[in-house]
Amino acid sequence: MEGLVVKNYAGFYYVDTGKAIYMCKARGKFKKDNIKILTGDRVIIRELVPNSEGVIESLLPRKNELIRPPIANVDQVLLVFAFADPFPSTELIDRLLVMAYALRLEVVLVFNKFDLVNPESQKLFEYYKKILPKVVAITARGDTGIDELTDYLNQKISVLAGPSGVGKSTLINRLVPGAKLATGEVSPKIKRGRHTTRHVELIKLPFGGFIADTPGFSNLTLPEMDKLELQSYFPEFNQNRKYCYFPNCLHVKEPNCRVRELLETGEIPPFRYENYLTFLEEITSDERSS
């Protein structure tokens, strides 16, 4: 019987077969062969107690695997930020975008708390909407943008990530009535929320698909990559690199650089270029130290 591991907790694996959720142990061969079963894995189980307990017999091939958070077979990442309270960090948005694209994952960028939108955050939202295929404004405590978001989530395994206090748990409670996840209110003193998620669990969406509220991405170190690779994760840089004089242009000091021309005319905002330079320096430092 095939199923999906939706939770790995206290030595038990909870496997959703579509008809029931089985509490399972894994056969000894997995430990012997040092094979770790992750949330998101598709497995074959043998039923021990009808619709209740089973044993994991085999692990099906993975499409992908994330280390932090430890989860397999992810289709896309939902990056959740807020229009305000807390105001979005563009450095964190861009860092998470690069990390997701480097892992070959699709991205849905969500701006929550639309009721708190201000001119500055609206401008940010509009720019990202121009350069990315899936950007949506929502109010997790209301209806704004929820239909559009459910279309993106339908029949996919999605990982939820973003800073604390932006409404990730509130969003899951909105999408899955009865989930009753703890919510982290924003501290008025530091304008950040309390972390409320302890382990990785896939929550079944009523309209199809699964969503994980994760404790990560706790490690925000960029994955290993070549300097030239970085710009491929900045769509507006990647689209214009062919117009640069040098084919291997890094858009730093090279003459006749199309990206820097667009920066000067305001078509590329300074924050995007500054974040690109920050990441490029990180990659360069890593190359020097290796």
From Swiss-Prot:
Q: Which UniProt keywords apply?
A: Cytoplasm, GTP-binding, Hydrolase, Metal-binding, Nucleotide-binding, Ribosome biogenesis, RNA-binding, rRNA-binding, Zinc
| A Pfam family reported for this protein in Swiss-Prot or TrEMBL | RsgA_GTPase
Residues binding Zn(2+): 244, 249, 251, 257
Location in or out of the cell: Cytoplasm
GO CC, sorted alphabetically, is:
cytoplasm
Judging by the UniProt lineage, the source's domain of life is Bacteria
A single GO BP term for this record reads: ribosomal small subunit biogenesis
Q: Where does GTP bind?
A: 112-115, 162-170
EC number(s) of the enzyme?
Answer: 3.6.1.-
CDD domains, alphabetically?
Answer: S1_YloQ_GTPase, YjeQ_EngC
Which family, according to UniProt?
Belongs to the TRAFAC class YlqF/YawG GTPase family. RsgA subfamily.
**Assembly and interactions?**
Monomer. Associates with 30S ribosomal subunit, binds 16S rRNA.
Q: What is this protein called?
A: Small ribosomal subunit biogenesis GTPase RsgA
Origin organism of this chain?
Carboxydothermus hydrogenoformans (strain ATCC BAA-161 / DSM 6008 / Z-2901)
Q: What is the lineage of its organism?
A: Bacteria, Bacillati, Bacillota, Clostridia, Thermoanaerobacterales
